[in-house]
C-alpha cells in the first residue's frame, strides 16, 4: 500500500511536519557535506586518464590542454556546468595538474567585495588555474571586474572617490579561469561569452558508476563484486558523489551485518535499511511526486505553488529535485508547470487520470 502525502509514517519527522528538508541530511543529495570533504580527497582522480565517464568533456579538454602546452600558453578559460556532484571541482584540479600549473580555489558567495577579487587577481601566477565555484552567485560588480582580467589580462582599479577618482590599469599574468555552475542560465551573456571552452557534464551511466565504485572500493580496501557494484550504481542517481557516499554506508553494513564483502544481497539489504529504493529515490522525492499527483491531479502545477506546498525553496526544486526526476522520465517540465508522468503513477501503483492517459 502506498502512503498518502499526509501520512507521517512515510517521511522523517521534519518532512512530515512540513518543515523544509535540509539537503545536507539527505543521503542521496548531491550537495556536498562537511563529512564528504576528506573522503572525496582520497578518491579524487588526479589526471584525465584516471577520470571515469564524461567522454566528450575529457576529449575536448585533452585536445585543448595538449594544444596549450605545445604553444607554451595558458589554457583558454573553461566553464563547466551541470548538476552538482558530477566532478566539476575534480576536473578543475585535473586541469591544473595537466597544465603543471598552480591551483587556487574560491567561490561566488565567498567573494563579497571588489577588494576580495582584486587581491586574488593581482597575485595570480603565470598560467595559474583560478577556480571559481558557484560562479552564478558572483555579484554583478565583481563579474564586471573579471571581464578585462580574463579577456585582456588587465585589471582596472579606481583610486579615490568623486571627481578626483582616477582609473589605474594593472597587468595581470596570463591565467586560466575555470568556473563551475549548476545554473548556467543565470550567467550574464557578457561573462559567458568570455569562456573559450564551455562544457556540460551529464549524469553518469550505470557502467561508468560501477567502474567508479570498484576503484573507490579498492582505495578504501573493501571487497566488492560485480553484483554489489551494480546494485549501488543503479541507486546513486547517476552521480559519483552519491555513489561514493552510499558505498561508505554499505561498507559499514557489510562489516557489521555481513561478511565484510559487498555483494548484491548485502548492498540490497543495506540500501533498504537506508530507505534508498531501486531508482535512487528517497522520501523527499516521493513526497514531491505524490504532492503533484494527489494535490494537483498530476499537474500541471506552477513552480511557486509546488514550492509552497512542499515548504521548499524554488531553487532547491529546480536545482536538486527536478533534474534527476526529469532525466528518468517521472516528471515533465512544461510551459504551464510541472506534470507527473505515467511512470510516476506506475511507481505508486496508481491509475493516471484520463487527461494523463491521453498524454501518454
From Swiss-Prot:
Main location: cytoplasm
One protein family per Pfam: AAA_lid_4
Record organism: Koribacter versatilis (strain Ellin345)
InterPro entries hit by this protein: AAA+_ATPase, AAA_lid_4, DNA_helicase_Holl-junc_RuvB, P-loop_NTPase, RuvB-like_N, RuvB_C, WH-like_DNA-bd_sf, WH_DNA-bd_sf
Start and end residues of each stretch annotated as Head domain (RuvB-H): 278-360
Region of interest (Small ATPAse domain (RuvB-S)), ranges: 205-275
The reaction(s) this protein catalyses: ATP + H2O = ADP + phosphate + H(+)
Sites where the protein binds DNA: 333, 338
Entry's Gene Ontology BP terms: DNA recombination; DNA repair
Biological role: The RuvA-RuvB-RuvC complex processes Holliday junction (HJ) DNA during genetic recombination and DNA repair, while the RuvA-RuvB complex plays an important role in the rescue of blocked DNA replication forks via replication fork reversal (RFR). RuvA specifically binds to HJ cruciform DNA, conferring on it an open structure. The RuvB hexamer acts as an ATP-dependent pump, pulling dsDNA into and through the RuvAB complex. RuvB forms 2 homohexamers on either side of HJ DNA bound by 1 or 2 RuvA tetramers; 4 subunits per hexamer contact DNA at a time.
Gene Ontology cellular-component annotations: cytoplasm; Holliday junction resolvase complex
EC number(s) given by UniProt: 3.6.4.-
Annotated protein name in UniProt: Holliday junction branch migration complex subunit RuvB
Region annotation (Large ATPase domain (RuvB-L)) ranges: 12-204
Self-association state and partner proteins as the record states: Homohexamer. Forms an RuvA(8)-RuvB(12)-Holliday junction (HJ) complex. HJ DNA is sandwiched between 2 RuvA tetramers; dsDNA enters through RuvA and exits via RuvB. An RuvB hexamer assembles on each DNA strand where it exits the tetramer. Each RuvB hexamer is contacted by two RuvA subunits (via domain III) on 2 adjacent RuvB subunits; this complex drives branch migration. In the full resolvosome a probable DNA-RuvA(4)-RuvB(12)-RuvC(2) complex forms which resolves the HJ.
GO molecular function annotations of the record: ATP binding; ATP hydrolysis activity; four-way junction DNA binding; four-way junction helicase activity
Notes concerning its domains: Has 3 domains, the large (RuvB-L) and small ATPase (RuvB-S) domains and the C-terminal head (RuvB-H) domain. The head domain binds DNA, while the ATPase domains jointly bind ATP, ADP or are empty depending on the state of the subunit in the translocation cycle. During a single DNA translocation step the structure of each domain remains the same, but their relative positions change.
Residues binding ATP, per UniProt: 43-44, 85, 88-90, 151-153, 194, 204, 241
Keyword Nucleotide-binding: yes
Family: Belongs to the RuvB family.
